């Protein structure tokens, strides 16, 4: 077997893990968040380059290490261990908020109320940590140090990486939910331009991978399709539904698309075609990408709904009461998503990222909506409302959040470079961890460099 086929086989025919274990892994991100807050509250976090390295250790290396050792130690044991440093700090050291309150711009006055930073730290934590988990996994999966149960499943089941794909869509929708630019005269032109850029990226990736004979997992999206094509066509689909059904809420719209897609899969030969049709024409060659598109559009709308609840009508001071009010508004949608998932299981409809079917959409939307609210509540309950946004968010995470698409692009390019330069399949765990550390450091440094130079790329 050639090395290319060996690498393709390494990520094929996998069955995944459980949603419970995946949530356990995501709790590690919460633990890292709490640790950073505890260090910040006690003014023991270094400044400058050393501070950047400490944040890199907390938010990149701890999750990487947890993923690696989780094949030997239970995930929930690791969760408990991850919260221990914060507990120790809480016991032995007092909190000092005065240093953070004294930072310039932290006090709300009539003079600065129009420019007071209304960004919500919990949203930044959620979006940036989801992005860092995603970019960690896309390279780590090519090393043997990455447990196979966290890699993308072949057809039925779920895993950490399966969640990561949907989470990218949900996270993108979250920040789009606060906007209401559908009525603007140039709205369609903007959507076309954004889609064009994403499709160009998709074609560039396709031609590059074909020209260098790069390994491909065909059953993931198809022979030519890739994630950038999904993003490009999704933007057009979202615009079409928003323009056609203006008065329907984002949540109802997402549920309608999910159920319509489910009926199409179950009541017609569409599911059979998507999973087993001979690849005799351009559509059949890319059947997975086409079949999963409605599901990803639905996930995006669920993200938009969540963003419209969390980010709309923000007060000048985001208090505990405001956070709790947002959480209460999301309780009913969370219950609906949970029911959708449980009913799907009861009817023996398997979770499938390959199809982006109802249980997959419900699972992704529920987990993301739930963890986003947890991040927001943690921020509100651990920080006094008088502490400014700039003191509530690590610079590393803010930089990653501000340039999410560029960070994702850089990660894709670096993943290709590493795979072409190293025999990842036969690398020792020590070598794999070293390469992963350098890879993550370059990504974080590039995000920091882009922020320092005011470069921000948004679609």
Swiss-Prot record:
Localization of this protein: Endoplasmic reticulum membrane
Enzyme Commission numbers on file: 2.3.-.-
Q: In which pathway does it act?
A: Glycolipid biosynthesis; glycosylphosphatidylinositol-anchor biosynthesis
Q: Tell me any Pfam family this protein matches.
A: GWT1
Transmembrane region positions? Answer: 20-40, 50-70, 73-93, 120-140, 156-176, 188-208, 221-241, 250-270, 290-310, 331-351, 364-384, 405-425, 432-452
Keywords for the protein's UniProt record, in alphabetical order: Acyltransferase, Endoplasmic reticulum, Glycoprotein, GPI-anchor biosynthesis, Meiosis, Membrane, Transferase, Transmembrane, Transmembrane helix
Q: Looking at its record, which EC class is this enzyme?
A: transferase
Alphabetically, the GO molecular function entries are: glucosaminyl-phosphatidylinositol O-acyltransferase activity
Q: Name one GO cellular component term.
A: endoplasmic reticulum membrane
Glycosylation: residue positions: 13
Question: What does the UniProt function comment say about this protein?
Answer: Probable acetyltransferase, which acetylates the inositol ring of phosphatidylinositol during biosynthesis of GPI-anchor. Has a role in meiosis.
Protein name per Swiss-Prot or TrEMBL: GPI-anchored wall transfer protein 1
Question: From which source organism is this entry?
Answer: Schizosaccharomyces pombe (strain 972 / ATCC 24843)
Q: What is the lineage of its organism?
A: Eukaryota, Fungi, Dikarya, Ascomycota, Taphrinomycotina
Gene symbol here is gwt1
């Amino acid at each position: 077997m050639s090395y290319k086929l060996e690498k393709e086989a390494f990520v094929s025919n996998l069955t995944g893990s459980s949603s419970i274990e995946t949530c356990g892994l995501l709790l590690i991100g919460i633990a890292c968040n709490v640790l950073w807050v505890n260090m910040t509250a006690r003014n023991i976090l270094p400044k400058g380059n050393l501070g950047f390295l400490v944040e890199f250790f907390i938010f990149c290396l701890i999750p990487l290490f947890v993923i690696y050792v989780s094949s030997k130690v239970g995930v929930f044991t690791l969760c408990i261990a991850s919260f221990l440093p914060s507990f120790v700090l809480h016991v032995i050291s007092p909190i000092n908020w005065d240093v953070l309150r004294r930072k310039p711009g932290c006090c709300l006055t009539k003079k600065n109320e129009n420019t007071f930073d209304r960004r919500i730290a919990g949203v930044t934590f959620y979006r940036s940590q989801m992005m860092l988990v995603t970019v960690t996994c896309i390279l780590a999966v090519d090393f043997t140090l990455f447990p196979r149960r966290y890699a993308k499943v072949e057809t039925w089941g779920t895993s950490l990486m399966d969640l990561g794909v949907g989470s990218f869509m949900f996270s993108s929708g979250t920040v789009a939910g606060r906007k209401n630019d559908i009525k603007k005269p140039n709205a369609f032109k903007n959507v076309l331009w954004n889609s064009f850029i994403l499709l160009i990226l998709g074609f560039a990736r396709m031609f590059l991978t074909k020209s260098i004979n790069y390994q491909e997992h065909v059953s993931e999206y198809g022979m030519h399709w890739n994630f950038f094509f999904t993003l490009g066509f999704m933007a057009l689909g979202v615009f079409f539904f928003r323009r056609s059904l203006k008065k329907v809420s984002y949540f109802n719209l997402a549920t309608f698309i999910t159920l319509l897609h489910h009926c199409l899969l179950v009541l017609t030969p569409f599911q059979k075609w998507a999973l087993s049709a001979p690849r005799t024409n351009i559509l059949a060659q890319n059947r997975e990408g086409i079949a999963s598109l409605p599901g990803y559009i639905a996930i995006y709308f669920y993200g938009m709904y969540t963003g419209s609840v969390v980010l709309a009508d923000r007060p000048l001071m985001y208090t505990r009461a405001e956070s709790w009010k947002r959480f209460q508004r999301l309780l009913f949608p969370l219950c609906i998503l949970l029911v959708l998932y449980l009913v799907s299981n009861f009817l023996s409809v398997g979770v499938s990222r390959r199809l982006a079917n109802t249980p997959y959409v419900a699972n992704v939307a529920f987990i993301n909506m739930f963890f986003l609210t947890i991040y927001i509540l943690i921020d509100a309950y651990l920080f006094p409302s008088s502490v400014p946004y700039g003191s509530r968010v690590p610079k590393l995470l803010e930089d990653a959040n501000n340039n999410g698409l560029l960070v994702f692009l850089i990660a894709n390019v670096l993943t290709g470079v590493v795979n072409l330069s190293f025999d990842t399949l036969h690398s020792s765990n020590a070598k794999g961890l070293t390469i992963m550390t350098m890879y993550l450091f370059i990504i974080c440094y590039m995000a920091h460099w882009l922020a320092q130079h005011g470069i921000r790329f948004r679609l």
